[in-house]
Amino acid sequence: MPKHGKRYRALEGKVDRNKQYSIDEAAALVKELATAKFDETVEVHFRLGIDPRKSDQNVRGTVALPHGTGRSVRVAVITKGENVQAAEAAGADVVGSDELIERIAGGFMDFDAVVATPDMMAQIGQKLARLLGPRGLLPNPKSGTVGADVAGMVRGLKAGRIEFRNDKTGVVHAPIGKASFESGNLSANYQALISALEGAKPGTAKGVFLRSAYLTTTMGPSIPLALGGAALA
């Protein structure tokens, strides 16, 4: 493992490893630790008390962050008929049906999210599943990207709705904003995420569900969080 440079070590020295920070404390500190020359993304990492090898214990859901993510989301919509106009009016970046499917199959990937109406899913599954699936872009009802309300799906993604799911180690990684956000807005986004995560707890998961949590930025050290809300020294 490569060693961290002086800058990183200096920032890490500002984090008390014997303390669990309240989200308000951590949100203020994470802004101080974001010293890169770009607006770093602020992320939270939750270790869950699940067995990710068991499909009935996997966690997946969506949440609308009240203050958005701070990034511009390019949305592609695969639909036809009157839904095309509805998607365009809602701000979709690219809209189409069969021709868009063929375009994506040919290598077009200038988007961050894909939504679709149910009538297009058979073709999408046949032609795009292997391409979009590994990238986490395949439309799915569970992630709120398949449905009849294309305008609502587009607006939700543009406004800051994110999808969360555990990885193969039972950890959920999710963005909650940018380092330029007010600390109170980061805290509010965190609270929305943790509420959604708790609501997605599988019925088969036993014991403590939220094992640990850390707040971090793109280039900064992680900050341990107190899951009970108050700081723990």
UniProtKB/Swiss-Prot annotation:
It holds the Pfam family Ribosomal_L1. Keywords: Repressor, Ribonucleoprotein, Ribosomal protein, RNA-binding, rRNA-binding, Translation regulation, tRNA-binding. GO terms for biological process: regulation of translation; translation. It comes from the Bacteria. SUPFAM superfamilies: Ribosomal protein L1. Part of the 50S ribosomal subunit. Belongs to the universal ribosomal protein uL1 family. This is Large ribosomal subunit protein uL1. The gene is rplA.
